[in-house]
Amino acid sequence: MSPTSETAKGGRRLVIVESPAKAKTIKGYLGPGYVVEASVGHIRDLPSGAAEVPEKYTGEVRRLGVDVEHDFQPIYVVNADKKSQVKKLKDLLKESDELFLATDEDREGEAIAWHLQEVLKPKIPVKRMVFHEITKDAIRAAVANPRELNQKLVDAQETRRILDRLYGYEVSPVLWKKVMPRLSAGRVQSVATRLVVERERERIAFRSAEYWDLTGTFATGRAGDASDPSSLVARLQTVDGRRVAQGRDFDSLGQLKSANTLHLDEANARALAAALENTRFAVRSVESKPYRRSPYAPFRTTTLQQEASRKLGFGAKSTMQVAQKLYENGYITYMRTDSTTLSDTAVSAARAQVTQLYGADYLPPQPRTYAGKVKNAQEAHEAIRPSGDRFRTPAETGLTGDQFKLYELIWKRTVASQMKDATGNSVTVKIGGAASDGRDVEFSASGKTITFHGFLKAYVEGADDPNAELDDRERRLPQVAEGDALTAEEITVDGHATKPPARYTEASLVKELEEREIGRPSTYASIIGTILDRGYVFKKGTALVPSFLSFAVVNLLEKHFGRLVDYDFTARMEDDLDRIARGEAQSVPWLRRFYFGEGDGTGGGGAADAGNGDGDHLGGLKELVTDLGAIDAREVSSFPVGNDIKLRVGRYGPYVERGEKDAENHQRADVPEDLAPDELSVELAEELLAKPSGDFELGTDPATGHAIVAKDGRYGPYVTEVLPEGTPKTGKNAVKPRTASLFKSMSLDTVTLDDALKLMSLPRVVGADAEGVEITAQNGRYGPYLKKGTDSRSLQTEDQLFEITLEEALAIYAQPKQRGRAAAKPPLKELGTDPVSEKPVVVKDGRFGPYVTDGETNATLRSDDSVEEITPERGYELLAEKRAKGPAKKTAKKAVKKTAAKKAPAKKAAATKKTAAAKTTAAKKTAAKSTAKKTTAKTAAKKATASKTSED
């Protein structure tokens, strides 16, 4: 029976969803007897501070928002910004005869539905309405087939929320006292931060190895074509039967893993190349194997985040935001899922499109099934796919921008999942010969031809490694047979150096967390966002770089809260929480063991001590945070660099120091905030210490009482005010300190307080023209200028900023605007130096709206970006995305020659010992010196939020 005919008998139904966008879409599918309203997310939560806790609660309950002495009873309060919405829902409920709770079908959605029921206290029938796609048929089916609330899911979500509150509110204050105020710890965020820090430690300990090899271009002697090339390129594989070392044959200290491998240095490689000049080569073997590649499974949350990062340059958060919009507007199924399963309807829709778009030859006789799911999956139960029983092609959707790109990605992946395998042949050709000195050499070439593209016709998965070959890439070799003679047209001597392990990107960090079974797919985007916001990591291009602050935090947690950041322990916690969700374990006993350490197996054992699967491996958090006297704050935040220099993380950021504070030979210098820990060498530290102190206190602003200091910053010397401790640094109430660059005629050692106050008073209002449009004098990266509306004019000197009169300004505007460089508009915002191009990045106003540019690459701001809010990191990310999409640069083909040599990169010095926060390699000295001249505008403390707790 349809919803419309049901309500025709009388009655009014209230349907509550999370978001207004979702409400708007669903409303169009239901009849006039339905009222669809949004809760606008969670309406109730644990209190964010003691001020929100009802007065009847005192002591620990007031601090934590959880009564740990009475079965961990949570104290819920209606969010201040949701009170008016709750009143609206209650008013609508009074006029309704039935309530449908239509929140998302996952654990979080079930909790929202339960909180709505608890707060609204309906006296009418209540039904739980679930669906995983917003289509007319799906919504009507959900109305016709409601269910009861799943209390197990509700309990599981509540347990997670309480656990995260206890973890955050008990451990975070330790960080405030021992490292820096306003930091945070979290069940998953701290482990994710540790992963990034450990990868940087590996890079710090890494020693590069130089190795050489030979590459030969061999000709068959016959004319070739596209299907049968006339030559092939092969790499030297063995010399006298010993395999020639490649990068994978060296360990992280630059040593060969096996003595049986031949390590060629430059001299030996060149000598061998010379000995091969007149060698006669022949094909020794041709091995052909069938090639088959099956389609990739449809997307789940994490694979969508990873692929959107690789192919579209989206961060995890951006991917989920775009996917949320697509879901709410009825284009895709629910985007938080661990499943790769497709419904029968979806399989039929995908197979129909395969036949329609690619033909019956691309359709397998039987539907493909993808039953594999992540362990303990508790999210929605179908893969992410286009919605409906007939998939709209991307062109049919009318979508634009990021929504179009992500929909197209999902659509292609889904359709491809129901196509035939790609098939072909892979071939390996071995080419041998004898050098003039008698040594036997063997070169090897591999090829691949695809005879039937199958699913590759529709979709090819990206790769995290930029050097990895994609599945649809063919390498055709000449048709040769064993014994065929070949001529060496060119023997190239190639030098290489092993590289440190790559830093995590958002995509690879998500993959790592999932493989370790830490956290849940629905939380990964927010976790990465949190560690970026807290200043624990920052981005260089797409790489996630740990800050020195994160080294201090992880150092403390590892030494004093080892269990809490142990990977296996965290995964077992996740497993226990899922057992609670399935009803196989009880919440309160588990929380009691976690917090108080009750139960067997908790007598101080390490995180690796496995329990019986019922939480017995948990220790007592309360006891861990009670005795803090043993934690030496200075020790956990100090890291040796070398030459008696230490890197320390202070309340206002990292610095290097030699000697004790009160000693006569004491030296101290700030470390640039954007310096990667693996770039801090002894040489760079010495250079920093040799420079004058970075901060010059000029005095106090009489108007505000704030201290005014001069600094040598990343973009040159500047003055700024020091805001009082406790001033909000993030969020809508954030306060930014006044800052201004020094004039070219000024220097750090001569600038005065009066100079600083004048500089920080800019821009100066000069006056208004006859039409009342304000004219201001401003100082920018490209010099002083006047601004009137969107019309800007350059000034000749910096002094004019304070001296120019209204009459003089009007006279300048009365002149025709100059063309060429002088006519260029000043930037809307200056972001800093791009880590890739090393050029200044600015925001400009273009014909099609604001865009970021470094002078070489332009990238338009997206719909959810604004000139006022865009950060330097976001600007660099947009440019990196644009570069990734651009055409690859073509290099001119070199003339054929007999012997050529490519110089290996300079080998790192391996003599100097490196420690957790220092790296002394000659190869990095130059880069480190360059970086030393820069410092970011934001410190780690500025990035930290005032929130005590964190989700996960």
From Swiss-Prot:
Protein name in the entry: DNA topoisomerase 1
Subunit structure: Monomer.
Domain Toprim: 12-135
Similarity comment text for this entry: Belongs to the type IA topoisomerase family.
Basic and acidic residues bias spans: 871-884
GO molecular function, one term: DNA topoisomerase type I (single strand cut, ATP-independent) activity
Cofactors, names only: Mg(2+)
Binding of Mg(2+), residues: 18, 104
Interaction with DNA, as annotated region: 184-189
Biased composition (Low complexity): 907-930, 937-952
Function per UniProt: Releases the supercoiling and torsional tension of DNA, which is introduced during the DNA replication and transcription, by transiently cleaving and rejoining one strand of the DNA duplex. Introduces a single-strand break via transesterification at a target site in duplex DNA. The scissile phosphodiester is attacked by the catalytic tyrosine of the enzyme, resulting in the formation of a DNA-(5'-phosphotyrosyl)-enzyme intermediate and the expulsion of a 3'-OH DNA strand. The free DNA strand then undergoes passage around the unbroken strand, thus removing DNA supercoils.
Catalytic reaction(s) noted: ATP-independent breakage of single-stranded DNA, followed by passage and rejoining
Skewed-composition ranges (Basic residues): 885-906
Region listing for Disordered, in residue ranges: 847-952
Keywords: DNA-binding, Isomerase, Magnesium, Metal-binding, Topoisomerase
EC number: 5.6.2.1
PANTHER family hit by this protein: DNA TOPOISOMERASE, DNA TOPOISOMERASE, TYPE IA, CORE
Entries under HAMAP family matching the protein: Topoisom_1_prok
InterPro entries for this protein: Topo_IA, Topo_IA_2, Topo_IA_AS, Topo_IA_cen, Topo_IA_cen_sub1, Topo_IA_cen_sub2, Topo_IA_cen_sub3, Topo_IA_core_domain
Organism of provenance: Streptomyces coelicolor (strain ATCC BAA-471 / A3(2) / M145)
Catalytic center residues: 334 (o-(5'-phospho-dna)-tyrosine intermediate)
GO biological process terms, semicolon-separated: chromosome segregation; DNA topological change
The Topo IA-type catalytic domain, residue ranges: 150-602
Chain positions of site Interaction with DNA: 42, 160-161, 164, 169, 176, 336, 534
